[in-house]
Amino acid sequence: MRIEQELKLGFKDVLFRPKRSTLKSRSQVELTRDFTFKHSGRQWSGTPVIAANMDSVASFEMAAALAEHGVMTAVHKHYTVEQWAEFAKTADKKTLNNVFVSTGTSEAEFEKVKKIMALSEEFVFICIDIANGYSEHLVEFVQKVRAEFPTKVISAGNVVTGDMVEELILAGADIVKVGIGPGSVCTTRVKTGVGYPQLSAIIECGDAAHGLGGMIIGDGGCSCAGDVSKAFGGGADFVMLGGMLAGHSESGGEVVEQDGKQYMKFYGMSSQSAMDKHSGGVAKYRAAEGKTVLLPYRGSVHNTISDILGGVRSTCTYVGAAKLKELTKRTTFIRVQEQENNVFGKE
């Protein structure tokens, strides 16, 4: 047993230090990034925010809506091949180019991904997603998927330390998904005692990935636009959002009415709700590691994503970053014990 003494930080522990800027308006900030991926050699241009691969967030409808903003969607893995075929026929090229096809690591899921990717040349991104990315099985699965799809962009996770980021990139992942336990409906840290404060995880994993020419997705922990900016400032190439994009008409969640008001069900993918729906209940050998909440119905996602991106633009003007690419170079975080004034409630 050993104890690491170095303090690790989450988004609530820091604020950006403002810096002198020549920017006159938020409209001057360029949020589009241009990426070339290490293994596939593919190029992509867009706003590097991703809707999380949860079935109460990342629907086909969400993918179409977010693509209008140049934003990506990791479509959840519970659609059938037939549903994907219909989506491939009806969606436009921009939407298809901005979706990840999500998968677990079983043999059946591998066969399913092969069928989905064969539906359209426009499917470029694969998201290999398991809760515990420290499994040797994940590394082997990444190698297998890379051998099958040498020209596709592969994301794999989730992990929170540089050593595992490096191993996954060397195994064939272009992007590594970073985050264990920070999500709004995740209870892994409570049920298991395992986790890592998200900002420190992003800083350390980003450093490891960039040293090998790979990239990272900061997955989870964002509760406001400022947190999204902090993730980018800490070195995340992409930021993945679940709860911030849940509860919308495009989210795909179940609508519930209580006291004359509409709510949408939102749950973690290791929650009792998810396992009841997709696995016939919680297996005897495991515990649910997520919760189910009812969110007030929020209407269309367009206003929400515009508000998030507007917040990131504003961050850039405060620190003098004309492009999102420059944000991490212009970032100085200060450690704090307060964030916002809550006299009149939370924003």
UniProtKB/Swiss-Prot annotation:
Keyword Chloroplast among UniProt keywords: no
EC number of the protein: 1.7.1.7
Binding sites annotated in the UniProt record for NADP(+): 108-131, 216-239
One function term, GO molecular function aspect: GMP reductase activity
Organism superkingdom: Bacteria
Active-site positions on this chain: 186
Record has DNA repair as a keyword: no
Cross-referenced PROSITE patterns: IMP_DH_GMP_RED
Cited Gene3D superfamilies: Aldolase class I
Catalytic activity from the UniProt record: IMP + NH4(+) + NADP(+) = GMP + NADPH + 2 H(+)
InterPro entries named among the record's database cross-references: Aldolase_TIM, GMP_reductase, GMPR, IMP_DH/GMP_Rdtase_CS, IMP_DH_GMPRt
Family in the record: Belongs to the IMPDH/GMPR family. GuaC type 1 subfamily.
Function, as annotated: Catalyzes the irreversible NADPH-dependent deamination of GMP to IMP. It functions in the conversion of nucleobase, nucleoside and nucleotide derivatives of G to A nucleotides, and in maintaining the intracellular balance of A and G nucleotides.
Name this polypeptide is given: GMP reductase
Organism, as annotated: Vibrio atlanticus (strain LGP32) (Vibrio splendidus (strain Mel32))
Encoding gene, per UniProt annotation: guaC
